[in-house]
Amino acid sequence: MSSVTMRQMLEAGVHFGHQTRYWNPKMAPFIFGERNKIHIINLEQTLPLFNDAMNYLGKLAGNGGKILFVGTKRSARDTIAEEALRCKMPYVNHRWLGGMLTNFKTVRESIRRLKDLELMREDGTFNRLSKKEALMRTRELEKLERSLGGIKDMNGLPDAMFVIDVGYEKIAVKEANKLGIPVIAVVDTNNSIEGVDYVIPGNDDAMRAIQLYVSAAADAIANAQVTSRATAAPAGDDEFVEVREGAEASKKKATVKKKAAPRAASGESAEAAAE
């Protein structure tokens, strides 16, 4: 379970929705009331839903799943990149390119081009080009890095997608829905919960609120990864012992063979192994 409390949510402004005139009726069950023509989100509903979402992310990460972090609006960009890198997950924090998931084969070609350009920069190829060519390659590299840098090591479709602001990232959500990829998302009062598997009702504009959501998600993933590695460690030790015992048995068998007659060797080695 997440360690985030209701007080922390209040302090981060998670409960502040949008102006009442922009509300989406499908968010009605999560609205507590209104103040100064601003909808107030019911944190008594948000907190358990938030915990469910974090638990799901943790279980998925513990089983080796990949979670794609998506937040391209200005207030979310830096936090998305920092926290996704911290828990070693892919991310998109600039403009979502149409087909980034549904046409991933083509995107892979662009990623390959990005890696080629990075290699050219590192091995000094750029320095051997004319100024004009070097500038063109540098600009191409920067453009690809900005749009694809966060997913260049993803190697395949993600197992889930964590989204800040489903309205702003509606194309990403649609692509995930089309491919059957679960969506965990922060949904404000002006957006619909359709297409979202794990809804987190909350403010999707305030930087402090965004930092709270994303850092908690990264914590859940990182903690699950550590626990998974710790649980897997004893299994590795057992396997090593079995190999060592097998080697000793083979050595014992070889010794018996050397002493015994050829016809009796197999029987005596079996008895030695049984002992």
Curated annotation (Swiss-Prot):
Gene3D superfamilies referenced in this protein's UniProt entry, alphabetically: Glucose-6-phosphate isomerase like protein, domain 1 (3.40.50.10490), Helix hairpin bin (1.10.287.610)
Domain of life, source organism: Bacteria
GO molecular function, one term: structural constituent of ribosome
Transmembrane portions of the chain: none
Renumbered residue ranges of the record's region Disordered: 244-275
GO CC, one annotated term: cytosolic small ribosomal subunit
Gene Ontology biological process terms, A to Z: translation
Bias (Low complexity) ranges: 262-275
InterPro entries recorded: Ribosomal_uS2, Ribosomal_uS2_bac/mit/plastid, Ribosomal_uS2_CS, Ribosomal_uS2_flav_dom_sf
Bias kind Basic residues: ranges: 252-261
Pfam families: Ribosomal_S2
Keywords: Ribonucleoprotein, Ribosomal protein
Family according to the record: Belongs to the universal ribosomal protein uS2 family.
Xref: HAMAP family: Ribosomal_uS2_B (MF_00291_B)
Protein name: Small ribosomal subunit protein uS2
Organism, as annotated: Thioalkalivibrio sulfidiphilus (strain HL-EbGR7)
Organism taxonomic ancestry: Bacteria, Pseudomonadati, Pseudomonadota, Gammaproteobacteria, Chromatiales
Gene: rpsB
